[in-house]
Amino acid sequence: MMKALVVGGSSGIGLSLVLQLLHSDKVEKVYVVDKAAFPESHREERVDYVCCDLSRNDFSVLNRMNDIQALYITAGFGHLDFFQKLSEPYIDDSFAVNAVAPIKIIHRYYDRLLAQEDFACAVMVSIAGRISSPLFSVYSATKAALSKFIEAVNVELEVQGSRNRILEVSPGSLKGTGFTGGESQPELTADLAKEIIEHATRHEELYIPQYEEVFKDVIARYEADAHKFGVESYWYKKNSGRA
């Protein structure tokens, strides 16, 4: 039997991960840490929800969750707009929630990653952290920081003899997550949640959904000419009505 922690598990892909974990009879408990309340429609006795605002930099609620064998961090937010329109509090909160909180939470459980026992760990990053993303300047900066952190720490885990790794999950836009507003639709992200759990359980380091179909070409175009790619990215967002 195992216990898992899902940070950001009340909505979006986090909620889908919780529901997929609960499908397994090997899962004894799923801790859910989120600012938003866990949906009543999905509550059951194996779900242990605790309210926590990651922007407050207080993770003491995790003190009693030291018996987990899997960690999934999905909390994060972003706002599409010109940089000059973003407030300083927004910038502070963006880095606190999207980058600092995941890093500090992983630090709390790092002894589990270093140990010889299996410890599954996955963090939702974003393809925006790997390419030029105008109008997502601060969001992409927070995700780039997180991506580089994961990349470096995975090497540290390897050279210290651990087989555990942190899985970076870097998708593009996802339907059903409620990221850009609206309700979460976990049925639309169920397959992705299954994939994340499988990749994390295999101790893989990077998972980009739809890589072959979409993002292999996207990344190649960015690496060929980052400036041209950035300009095209801006106009794509503008012409598609996202900006």
Where in this protein do the model-derived segments appear?
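C-terminal helical subdomain
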Residues: 164, 168, 180-221
